[in-house]
Design a protein with these regions (language model features):
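Rhodanese-like catalytic fold shared by cysteine-dependent sulfurtransferases
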Residues: 3, 19-40, 52-92, 101-147
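Bacterial N-terminal signal peptides
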Residues: 5-19
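Structural scaffold elements adjacent to functional motifs in cytosolic proteins
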Residues: 45-47
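Short, surface-exposed ligand- or partner-binding patches at beta-edge/loop junctions that are enriched
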Residues: 95-96
Length: 147
């Protein structure tokens, strides 16, 4: 019984650590780095949260809103991301969500779809163990125009 509990605890700990491990192995930027690159015209920022979240907190200034929960599924999401980058899969893009969890799940799909310079912002809009976040860092936000 004790051995079973220990094994189960180890499996649970490994499972909980996997998202953190996945996030640290992905190409990433801090919120401040992304903001600087975006301001210089060298980065397209894509907010993959849902419209309710955009309304609640606003969006990073200049970000394209493309919800990962697209009503048309993955194909609709891909179509809208392609539209945000004018069809250029070599565009320098960064994905942002609330805390970096969703971007760490979506980024590998974009890489499989041929996006060669895609990155994510692990601290997200509100912060995580990877950093303070876009909003707490005092970076500019704007209301969602399409919400």
């Amino acid at each position: 019984m004790v051995r079973c509990k220990v094994t189960l605890s180890i499996i649970l700990l490994i499972g909980l650590a996997m998202p953190i491990q996945a996030q640290t192995n992905l190409p990433s930027l801090t919120a401040s780095e992304a903001h600087e690159l975006q301001q210089a015209g060298e980065l397209i920022l894509i907010d993959i949260r849902q419209p309710e979240e955009w309304r609640e907190t606003g969006m990073a200034q200049g970000a394209a809103g493309v919800s990962m929960m697209h009503p048309e599924g993955g194909q609709g999401f891909l179509r809208d991301v392609l539209a945000a980058v004018n069809g250029d899969t070599d565009a320098n893009i960064a994905l942002i969500c609330r805390t970096g969890n969703r971007t760490s799940q979506v980024l590998p799909a974009l890489q499989r779809w041929g996006f060669t310079r895609a990155k994510h912002i692990p601290e997200g809009m509100v912060g995580s163990q990877f950093g303070p976040g876009w909003i707490p860092s005092g970076l500019p936000v704007q209301p969602c125009a399409a919400c």
